[in-house]
Amino acid sequence: MIFVLDVGNTNTVLGVYDGDELKHHWRIETSRGKTEDEYAMTIKALLNHVGLQFSDIDGIIISSVVPPIMFALERMCLKYFHIKPIIVGPGIKTGLNIKYDNPREVGADRIVNAVAGIHLYGSPLIIVDFGTATTYCYINEHKQYMGGAIAPGIMISTEALFARAAKLPRIEIARPDDIIGKNTVSAMQAGILYGYVGQVEGIVSRMKAKSSVPPKVIATGGLASLIASESSVIDIVDPFLTLTGLKILYEKNVDKKQ
């Protein structure tokens, strides 16, 4: 079985693959202060809950956009799993032709999403990932990673309203009854939800205009389903795109690392 870890700024998503099947998956808070022992105890409890042990895991791959956490995670893998993990980063075999000015600047999460997107859906392709930041990745018809856009995530914007506007409350992100809010909470929900729908449709439409072949638009991340339900430009919601990409990259690199 293969253990995959997608470390984001807010949450870490974990998955266990048995062959090509994602058997189990979990979401935990990303904590920069945890030691390798604390992470091991959390993961041990999750594995035990589904009848698994550290010894059931044959390989590990990690994608992270939080560099300070990597030391603890790598030590955890060595100490408890007795496995040296594959880390998504410079030197890893991806198969991507990255056309960024500096390819090393492309975040691990965006690389993993692009690998999975091309494998599952072909090209051209636009991938929208709703995380702490909302990222847009454009892959052309030649399967070249051309770049994209990065915007503040929905939660960041919501928290900024609460923190900077004295009379505005902290709210749940949800679909309001109407675009015209009748109270403060529904007005904020309308502004946040439909504001982001407008952002997605505006950026995606401009990216589509760069391609002579209509690209598929794939959405992933925690709020992808909510945004997609209100948008006409998203073709597919794939909540496990990043985990799939990690599994693919593991297979591309495992022989090289062993």
Curated annotation (Swiss-Prot):
PANTHER family given in the database record: TYPE III PANTOTHENATE KINASE
Metabolic or biological pathway: Cofactor biosynthesis; coenzyme A biosynthesis; CoA from (R)-pantothenate: step 1/5
Pfam families: Pan_kinase
Origin species: Geobacillus sp. (strain WCH70)
Names of the cofactor(s): NH4(+); K(+)
Assembly notes: Homodimer.
InterPro entries: ATPase_NBD, Type_III_PanK
GO molecular function, one term: pantothenate kinase activity
Cofactor info, note text: A monovalent cation. Ammonium or potassium.
Catalyses which reaction(s): (R)-pantothenate + ATP = (R)-4'-phosphopantothenate + ADP + H(+)
Record-stated family: Belongs to the type III pantothenate kinase family.
Cellular component GO terms, alphabetical: cytoplasm
Protein's UniProt name: Type III pantothenate kinase
Residue numbers binding ATP: 6-13, 132
Phylogenetic lineage: Bacteria, Bacillati, Bacillota, Bacilli, Bacillales
Keywords: ATP-binding, Coenzyme A biosynthesis, Cytoplasm, Kinase, Metal-binding, Nucleotide-binding, Potassium, Transferase
Subcellular localization: Cytoplasm
